[in-house]
Structures are given as structure tokens and as C-alpha cells.
Amino acid sequence: LTIGVIATRRLNRRREILFLVVPVIFYLVVALTVGMNIGVRHILVVYVFLYVLIGGAASILIGKSRKWAYVVGVLLLVHVASSALTFPNYIAYANELWGGPSQTYKYLTDSNADWGQQLKSVGRYLDQRGVKDCWFLYFAEGVAEPSYYGIPCKPLPTISTLWLNVPIDVPNSIDGPVLISASNLSGVEFGPGSLDPYGQFKLLKPTAVIDHGVFVFDGKFEMPLAAAISKVQKARNLAQEKQLERALQEAKAAVALAPDSIQTQLALGDILLEMGQPQQARTNYEKALELAKTIEPEFQIRSLPDIEQRLQSLETAER
């Protein structure tokens, strides 16, 4: 409605419109180009200008005809009802034209949809159903502790747990229920396709959705890449402790589980190199390089230079 009012020049206040629109455009351009594009919270200031502009347009319409008061009133009531139905998980709020809060994670992630705020509701859900054996892929794992909320689930590895070096053992197959935070289900952390150890769940219909942010899946699931990632972490920790033979066993097991994983090939190559086997390490590095060239360009930028540097170091050492 506001755009229509401005386009038809019913709101004939050029200076006031510029005063409200220019800051919005400038702020959005800066916010979207500085490399800190991680959440709508960084652009909340633009809403102040937009709401004033919307209020001005509504005032013009109502002044022209009282019928517009009913239209504006209905739109406000719809917005209030939409917001109330999202309670208590306002972080994931999206209106129904967008698809509602349970669809937000498909388009936005992190603080736009899920910051791990559903633990109390997850605890109640499991308690009401008497669930004692489950798995939880929790966005804030390693930072917040689900067990404090009475959640008995075993954890699944996330980027955060790997970064914090939280040891997690994952078998090749697991029995549900499996609970997955929206930010993890989106796949934004590990990457798309073959990089995502939990990609299969995107194709499945959840049994339930808790607070628009935790998806519940029942059944038995094969988890080779997640299991391999947990073994890679264990292998690297053992290598740091100079337990190279055990580290080698874990790395080989990781490759056996997920031979088409860049992570597993690099881990095995690194450990072989540390054990004084550069030729064998080269084989794994070259396989990792081959795999890296098949992923999306955005993720190639992260992987290729690192792998190429390893291979270059090998060539330098051999001269």
C-alpha cells in the first residue's frame, strides 16, 4: 500500500520521503556489503524509518476515504494474530505470505531463525512422550548444555563442537528419534550436497516441529559422514598426543566410512605425512583436491588453497 501511495503521488512530500528512504537504502547497502551479513538484527534500525513512512501512507489513505481505515485495521489485526501464533519463538517469526515461522530456516538461518532457544520446549516434548533414547543435533551444542533441561539425547557433531573440540562418538547408523535444530537442518554450517552429513533429513517429513525450530525425525538412519567426522576429530586429537598408530587407525576408519569426504582424505594424509610416509599422504591429498573441485565454488575457495598448499609443501620437501 505504501509503495502504491508513493507511486501515485498521493503522498506528495518529496523531502520527507527522501528523509525516510535514503537512510534505509544507505544502511542496507552498507550492511549487505561489509561481510557481516549474519542476521536481521543488524538492520533493525531501518524499521524505524519504514514504519514512519508506512504510517504516513496510511494516514493519507484514511484521510481520502474512511474505507481505508478498515483495510489498515484488518492488516494490523492479521499482523497481531500472526505474531501471537508464533509465541514463544519470536526469533523464527515470518508472516504467512513468507510461509510462516516453520519455513524461515529454508531461506534464512542463524539468528534469523534459530539460536538454540527451544531447549525448555524440547525437554517437555521428550518428557511427555517418555523418550529416553534419542539423538540431538543442537545448534548451540558445546555452548549450552541440553542435559540441564532434562534432555537425555546423545549429541551429534556440529561445526561448533568441532571448533570447541568436544569429543562426540557417532555410530554408522542410529535409531531415532533424531532432533535437529533448524540452523543445522538448513545445511549452512557444513555446506551443501556431499559436504553435509545431515542432508538426508531435508528430504524427509518430520514427525513434529518444536517451537518452529527443532525438527523431530523417527526411524533408523545411516550416518556414515557424521560417523566419519567424529573419527577424524578423534584421529587428530590422538595425533596431537603423538599416538600416531591409533590416530592412523581412526583416520583409515573415517575414510572407509566416507571415502568421498574432503575431511577424511585430508586427515589421513596429514597423519601419514606425520608418520613419515609422504608418498602415501600425496595420494590422499590428491584425492581431496579432486573432490574439492566438484563442490560449489563458494566452498572451493575455502578448501582448494589449503589442499594445494599441502601438495606444494610435499613437492618442496622432495626437492
Language-model region placement:
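C-terminal luminal/periplasmic domains and tails of membrane-associated envelope-modifying transferases
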Residues: 98-319
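Short beta-strand segments
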Residues: 1-4, 23, 75, 79, ...
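Hydrophobic/aromatic-rich transmembrane helices and adjacent perimembrane loops
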Residues: 1, 29-30, 37-61, 217
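Lipid-exposed faces of alpha-helical membrane segments in multi-pass integral membrane proteins
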Residues: 2-3, 22-30, 46-49, 71-81
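Transmembrane alpha-helix segments characteristic
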Residues: 11-32, 196-205
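Hydrophobic, aromatic-rich transmembrane alpha-helices
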Residues: 1-13
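Membrane-interfacial entry segments at the cytosolic side of transmembrane helices
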Residues: 12-17, 61-76
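Transmembrane alpha-helical segments
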Residues: 33, 57, 71-113
